[in-house]
Amino acid sequence: MLYNHITELIGNTPLLRIDPAVHQLANVEVYAKLETYNPFGSLKDRVAWGILKDEIELIVEKQQTIIEFSSGNTGKALAVLASLYGINYETITNRIKVPEVHDMLRLMGASIEVLPGMSECPDPNDPNDPLSYLEQKVHANPSRYFHTDQYRNAKNYQAHYEHTGQEIFADLGAVDYFFGALGTAGSTRGVSTFLKERYADLQTIGVVAEKGDFIPGLRNVDEMSEVGIFDKALYQDILTVDAQDALSGMLALISQSGVLGGPSSGAVYYAMLQYLKQQSQGWTGPKKVVFIVCDRVEWYLSYIQKRRPELFEQKVPEDSFWKLKADDFKQAPSIAPEQVERFLREEDPLIVDTRGSLAYKIGHVPNSINIPDDKLADILTFGIPFPHERTILFVCPKGDISKKFAFFLQRKGYKAYSLEGGMIQWRKNHQQLLRSPA
């Protein structure tokens, strides 16, 4: 089939029926919308082109720089499109956690500016947040930049309303259940709105990451409230998945269906199957279920290798930090803000700030040391660098990630705690912050 431009390949992705012998659900037909078939590898190709297609000629004429807050698939798609049209692309982020994504953006000529966010998600009330910084940058020089604004731009979900949803309906007609990952919420909002207009009984189920866990492309339920195009009323349920279960779902998709989806796709697949096992009991007629396969597994090999090293024939302890599941650390001991001063005075703990180095330099708890969470997790896989006789207090942006470290060390016999509410609560309480010298 002949095409004249790469953008003509965006959309019209296949819909794959999952063999009932694989999912083993009675009276259920499961279909995977394979967004991996988009030319740049993910469902975000639709969003990037949907935002740019009516503006690109003017952007080129003005020689503007496309700018976005992205550390993933939207950034990759925008970088390719900018390169095709001979213009610059700049991404603002507070940390790119997947090395392959960083390398790919560099390969495609993107300019990457890494900023210290107090949180790993957009916070419009925080002037240090990357999204707020980006908006200030654009406002200061509006003629220079074109801000695609994926978190609030209606064209994000319109791309899925006008295309993805229509494609699914053209193939299947009425759909009973639709499952999707929640990041910007554009795909679930657009698809579900289109499908629900044609079948009012559609059930839309969103999937988020467990608090304190990291699944590329997914946010946790608290972070979703900070995404402008997220509308909670559209969802009949929102399911939570941790990284280990997401990888189990991903591996099942790969090995049993030949679908090379990444961790976010695995999260949706795992959550969907667990949910339908309960819901489908007693169904007498067939139900049609659709889920989105967001992107490909190859982007995330380093992420997978850390969490499932045995797949790569690497030997690590069975109780590795990366093997922790969400239920393990929910009850991890925390120090409440009103208890902090007394705790610091009586325990004299070693304070370990697990945020990125830039965030630490801008403001940190006095006498704390900085070991970013991804580095600390790697270190703990092979040993514990802290003295056993010393009490340890872990600090992170919101008090979620620090719980994992506190639980892990408590299990090893250490006195370890998490700062409840993290640095965000510390700042709200106007407690002392130190700034590192430049």
Regions from the language model: what does each represent?
Residues 1-342, 347-350, 356-374, 378-382, ...:
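PLP-dependent amino-acid enzyme catalytic core
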Residues 384-386:
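Short, basic/hydrophobic alpha-helical segments
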Residues 393-398:
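Mid-chain, well-packed structural core segment of small domains
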Residues 430-438:
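Generic C-terminal helix-cap and adjacent flexible tail
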